[in-house]
Amino acid sequence: MFHGSMVALVTPMEADGSVSDASLAELVEFHIQKGTDAIVAVGTTGESATLDFDEHCEVIRKVVDRVAGRIPVIAGTGANSTSEAIELTRCAMQAGADACLLVTPYYNKPTQEGLYLHHKAVAEAVPIPQILYNVPGRTAVDMHNDTVVRLAEISNIVGLKDATGDLDRARDLVARCGGKIDLYSGDDATAMEFLLLGGKGVISVTANVAPAEMHQMCEAAMRGDRAAAEAINARIDLLHRNLFLEANPIPVKWALEQMGLIPPGIRLPLTRLSERFHAPVREALAAAGITLNA
């Protein structure tokens, strides 16, 4: 249903932490011009954890309105409360999003049956295409492949974003449910190999700063052209690593600020990038051929 380079869009903020509507609109245009295949709004990279409910819905609406049907918009609507996830997902559907991305419930550590029933409840309550999101490094819960296979039987669960970076796991998922749902990498460092295994795309942090390159790499990998994919990926490989020197989205927001694309705002408890990481992030941007503001 969705494919290619799907940017995990930052939510640009002014220095006081307010959402910058002007920068948000400019980012949407930047991505469409550079070939990004879909925009994922208000996920982890979009600071969903520090936007309140109304802000969350409003950012989704603004992205959908600005995109105006030119590329798909996938809205992050996960929560660790099933009822809240349902309400956020309903809000996204009403705003006109093409699909929703639902992270596994975090912190309260549900069982596999709890994960199944949570996602089943959201899917049954809101008839919009839904993509599961497994990122155990952040959530403290891991959705096992067996649970994914069960959920793949639900008609409007259409995909999985797997951010584990475990390619053996990805290979097993492709074999067991690749014909029922689409599988997306959520780990830039292993995304190329994930796509060569049969993945349909990547929900990418790197795409915030290198959208054209991520689009080109995805196209090459998905058509099975390893040599072309490797050549493109080599230019952005340092970004895949250095954009995670501190917790995402700290480094990528700083990088976008240096590129002149967003203001400096980020919400507590996240802080601006530590000075010791400025040089490594600049090095990664330079390796990718990205021009910074003077």
Curated annotation (Swiss-Prot):
The keyword Ubl conjugation does not apply. GO terms for molecular function: 4-hydroxy-tetrahydrodipicolinate synthase activity. Its EC number is 4.3.3.7. Its main location: cytoplasm. PROSITE patterns: DHDPS_1, DHDPS_2. Keywords: Amino-acid biosynthesis, Cytoplasm, Diaminopimelate biosynthesis, Lyase, Lysine biosynthesis, Schiff base. Pathway: Amino-acid biosynthesis; L-lysine biosynthesis via DAP pathway; (S)-tetrahydrodipicolinate from L-aspartate: step 3/4. Belongs to the DapA family. Catalyzes the condensation of (S)-aspartate-beta-semialdehyde [(S)-ASA] and pyruvate to 4-hydroxy-tetrahydrodipicolinate (HTPA). PANTHER family: 4-HYDROXY-2-OXOGLUTARATE ALDOLASE, MITOCHONDRIAL, DIHYDRODIPICOLINATE SYNTHASE. HAMAP family: DapA. This is 4-hydroxy-tetrahydrodipicolinate synthase.
